Structure formats: structure tokens, C-alpha cells
């Protein structure tokens, strides 16, 4: 089973072909093809190769499925006996992609 570890938007993801991953918003149309070139490690046929920092010639091809927004995350901070409170909400924008091919 071959897999790859890549970096996108400051986060690292471990994927195999056919996986569906939520990445940070990329402003791409659905069915568009995307190449992810910041590949940190690739495992093919039991051989693991690491990059310094990226693997030379390795890339991951993915197809955009759709874009969306995540569930709202509420942060609430209350300072007792001070009549002071703060409430904030946050929704993450994401792009859902399907990994089609790992090229190493």
C-alpha cells in the first residue's frame, strides 16, 4: 500500500490514492485538477523516502470535489464577578479534494 505525506496550508496530511481530504480554501472550480508538490515523504512498495525538506520529483494529483464551510465553533470567555464576557464564532472555509494519483 503506497501513501504520501504532504504539506498544505501549514498542516501535514497522510493520504493514499482515493482518499478524500479537506484542505484550506483554494478558489478552484469543481472537477478542476490540482497538483500538490510539497511532498514530505512517499512510501511505494514498502520503500519509504523522505525529502530534505521535499521529495524531488514527487507530486500528488487531486481533483476538486467542492468547496464549503465547516461547522461553527463557538468560543466563550467569562470573567466571574466582573460582569464581563466575550462570545465569538468561527467557521472554516475548506476545499474538499479526492486524491487521484501519487507520483514519486
Swiss-Prot record:
One of its GO terms (biological process) is translation. One of its GO terms (molecular function) is rRNA binding. It comes from the Bacteria. The keyword Magnesium does not apply. One of its GO terms (cellular component) is ribonucleoprotein complex. InterPro entries: bL21-like, bL21-like_sf, Ribosomal_bL21, Ribosomal_bL21_CS. Keywords: Ribonucleoprotein, Ribosomal protein, RNA-binding, rRNA-binding. It holds the Pfam family Ribosomal_L21p. PROSITE patterns: RIBOSOMAL_L21 (PS01169). Belongs to the bacterial ribosomal protein bL21 family. This protein binds to 23S rRNA in the presence of protein L20. Part of the 50S ribosomal subunit. Contacts protein L20. This is Large ribosomal subunit protein bL21.
Amino acid at each position: 500500500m503506497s501513501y504520501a505525506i504532504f504539506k498544505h496550508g501549514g498542516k501535514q496530511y497522510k493520504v493514499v490514492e482515493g482518499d478524500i481530504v479537506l484542505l484550506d480554501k483554494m478558489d478552484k472550480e469543481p472537477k478542476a485538477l490540482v497538483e500538490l508538490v510539497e511532498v514530505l515523504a512517499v512510501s511505494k512498495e514498502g520503500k519509504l523516502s523522505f525529502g530534505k525538506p521535499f521529495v524531488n520529483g514527487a507530486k500528488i494529483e487531486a481533483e476538486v470535489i467542492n468547496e464549503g464551510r465547516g461547522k461553527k465553533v463557538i468560543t466563550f470567555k467569562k470573567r466571574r464577578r466582573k460582569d464581563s464576557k466575550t462570545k465569538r464564532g468561527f467557521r472554516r472555509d475548506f476545499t474538499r479534494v479526492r486524491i487521484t494519483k501519487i507520483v514519486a
